[in-house]
């Protein structure tokens, strides 16, 4: 496998397709270039997805992310492009990318973009921190 930037996203079969489960990744080394100034823009990407048939292979994701370091891109455009590329490669049930860009001109920018597979409905959320372990039906 190459160890230089690469736009190819590799996948592998989801080992548990019968269950909705959440994959969370934090990618603190994203870099692209500001199309106005040519200066580097840095961001932490937070990727959350619920796979369907495929999962993303981590090294290919790293090389894909590196491939943006010499590209001119507005924050909004690059965030949505990454979502589109991941959605095309993975065809997930749900995917959300949060791009938290470092300060530029005194402004922090966060861009959030989502993809939802048509027809997919999330299961009800379970919040164990607020789970009532002593419901009123018990004495």
UniProtKB/Swiss-Prot annotation:
Listed EC numbers: 1.7.1.13
Pfam families xrefs: QueF
Keyword tags: Cytoplasm, NADP, Oxidoreductase, Queuosine biosynthesis
Active site: 34 (thioimide intermediate), 41 (proton donor)
Function: Catalyzes the NADPH-dependent reduction of 7-cyano-7-deazaguanine (preQ0) to 7-aminomethyl-7-deazaguanine (preQ1).
Family that this chain belongs to: Belongs to the GTP cyclohydrolase I family. QueF type 1 subfamily.
Top-level taxon of origin: Bacteria
Protein name according to UniProt: NADPH-dependent 7-cyano-7-deazaguanine reductase
InterPro entries: GTP-CH-I_C/QueF, NADPH_dep_7-cyano-7-deazaG_red, QueF, QueF_type1
Cellular component per GO, a single term: cytoplasm
Chemical reaction(s) catalysed: 7-aminomethyl-7-carbaguanine + 2 NADP(+) = 7-cyano-7-deazaguanine + 2 NADPH + 3 H(+)
Phylogenetic placement of the source organism: Bacteria, Pseudomonadati, Pseudomonadota, Betaproteobacteria, Nitrosomonadales
Cross-referenced Gene3D superfamilies: 3.30.1130.10
Species this protein is from: Nitrosospira multiformis (strain ATCC 25196 / NCIMB 11849 / C 71)
Binding site for substrate: 56-58, 75-76
Gene Ontology process terms (BP): queuosine biosynthetic process; tRNA modification
A GO MF term: preQ1 synthase activity
Chief place where the protein resides: cytoplasm
Location relative to the cell: Cytoplasm
Pathway: tRNA modification; tRNA-queuosine biosynthesis
């Amino acid at each position: 496998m190459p160890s230089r930037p690469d736009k190819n996203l590799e996948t592998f079969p989801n080992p548990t397709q019968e269950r909705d489960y959440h994959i969370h990744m934090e990618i603190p080394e994203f870099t692209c270039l500001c199309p106005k100034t040519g200066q580097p823009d840095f961001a932490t990407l937070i990727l959350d997805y619920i796979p369907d048939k495929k999962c993303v292979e981590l090294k290919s994701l790293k090389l894909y992310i590196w491939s943006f370091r010499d590209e001119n891109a507005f924050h909004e455009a690059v965030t949505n492009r990454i979502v589109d590329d991941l959605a095309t490669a993975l065809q997930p049930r749900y995917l959300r990318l949060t791009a938290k860009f470092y300060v530029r001109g005194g402004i922090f920018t966060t861009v959030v973009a989502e993809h939802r597979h048509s027809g997919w409905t999330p299961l009800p959320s379970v919040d164990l921190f607020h789970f009532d372990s002593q419901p009123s039906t018990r004495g």
